[in-house]
Amino acid sequence: YVIGFFAAIQAGNIAVPLFAPELPGHTERLDAVLSDATPSVILTTDSAAESVNAFLRKLPRGRRPRVIAIDAVPDSVGATFVPAELDSEDLAYLQYTSGSTRTPAGVEITHRAACTNVLQMILAGGLDTNIRSVSWLPLYHDMGLIMILFPPLCGGHITLMSPLAFVRRPRRWVKQLATESAFGRVFAAAPNFAFELAAQRGRPPAGETWDLSNVAGLLNGSEPVTISAIEKFTEAFAPYGFPATAIKPSYGMAEATLSVATIATDARPSVIYLDRDQLAEDRAVPVSPDAPMAVPHVSCGQVISSQWLTIVDPRTGNELPEGEIGEIWLHGDNIGRGYWGRTKETQDTFGNTLKSRLTQRSHATGTAAEARWLRTGDLGVYLNDNLYVTGRIKDLIIIDGRNHYPQDIEATASQASPAV
C-alpha cells in the first residue's frame, strides 16, 4: 500500500487512497468514489487482486480500470523508469471525505499542502528527525495517511499495524509505543474511542514492565474529544511512566490536509464547562462543573504555525469576538485546492472572504484582505485564546429558535439509563 501510494506520486499521477472491497459496510462508498475519481489504474497486491477484480466486474465495462498487482511487477521494470517532473502546486492525492452525511468528495491535496502540514505538525509537536511512530490507523483515512508522510519528509521511523490488530488487542499498540520508546521520542495519533478502549484492554499482563516515559505526543482527534477518555488512558498508564502531557486534544479535517490546532507540547489536556442554555444562544459562558446545565468541552489549544483560524458569523461573514460561537474558517498553505470535479462546491467552501475583521485581537491578522478562506461547517469559539469545537452546523437541531447540539442529547440519554 505504502509503496503503491508513493510510486503513483513519483510517476506524476494523482494517488487516491482507498480500501479493499471486502471492508464491511463500505461497498456503496467505494462505488461512489470510483465513479467520482474515474481512476485509470488500480494498484493492489497479488493476494487481493481477485477480490478487486470481482468487485470491478460488477461495474459497467466502461468504468473498469486496469488492475496492477504491484508485488507481481518485476524489479527490472524500474531500470527504465523516468521520474516525472513535479511542481509544488501539482496535485499529489485526493483525500475523500467520510461521506457520513453526503456523497464522498475528493479533497485535492497538492504537494505544497501535504508537505506544509507535515512540517507544521513537526513544529507544533517539537519533534525531530529521530521521531518514532506507531500507527494502526487505516491508510485511506487522512490521519493514517499523513503518518506515513513523516519518514520520507522528515526522517524517523514508523511501525504500522492493521486496525483489526488494534481493535482485537489494544495492548499491541500500547506495547509497541513502549518498545519504540527505547529508541527515541514517540509520536502517534488516534481517535478518541481508541484511548478509552486501550485504557480498558491495553494494560500489560502481570509481571510485564513497560516504559512509556518517552511518548512525546499522542494526537487525539478525528471525532469529538472527551475528558473521560483522556483521564482513563492517562491514569491507566501513569504507573508505566506515561507523561500527563502526552495526550494532545486536536482539531483538524481532510480539507486542511489534516492538522489545524492542538495544545502546547508542555500543556496538559484541559476542560471547561459551558452553560447549555447559553450555548443554545451561540454564547460560551463558563460555569462550575457541578452546575445543573454544565456541558464539558475539551480545549483543542491553539492553531498551529503558519495557519489562521477565525470564528465567523456564518450568516454575515463577519469575524466574531472571543466568547461568541460561530463557524470555524481556515486559511493557510496546508488547505486543499478544492473538491475534485465540483466547481460550485469548491467555490462555496474554499473561496470565501471575510466581510469584516475585528479591529482588536483579530485572528485573521497577517492575511491579505482578499485572502480565500475555507468554511469548515464546524462551530467553535475562542476562550482565553483556546479553541473549543462545539459541533457541526448541519447537525444542529433548532427548536423554537434555540440551538440543540445532538451530542448533548446523546449524553442526556446515556445518563438517563445504563441500558443506553
Residue ranges and their predicted role:
Residues Y1-P24, S135-P138, N403:
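Conserved AMP-binding/adenylate-forming
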Residues F5-P17, D36, H141, P152-C154, ...:
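Short hydrophobic alpha-helices that are characteristic scaffold elements of the AMP-binding
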Residues Q10-G78, P191-N192, L197:
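Structural core segment of the AMP-binding/adenylate-forming
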Residues N13-V33, D46-A48, G156-T179, Y405-I409:
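ATP-dependent adenylate-forming carboxylate-activation enzymes
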Residues V67-Y96, R102-T103, N117, L123-R132:
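Conserved pre-ATP/AMP-binding loop-to-beta segment of ANL
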Residues F183-A189, A199-A294, W308-L309, R315-E319, ...:
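Gly/Ser/Thr-rich phosphate-binding loop
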Residues H297-T310, P314-G323, E327-N403:
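Conserved ATP-binding/catalytic segment of the ANL
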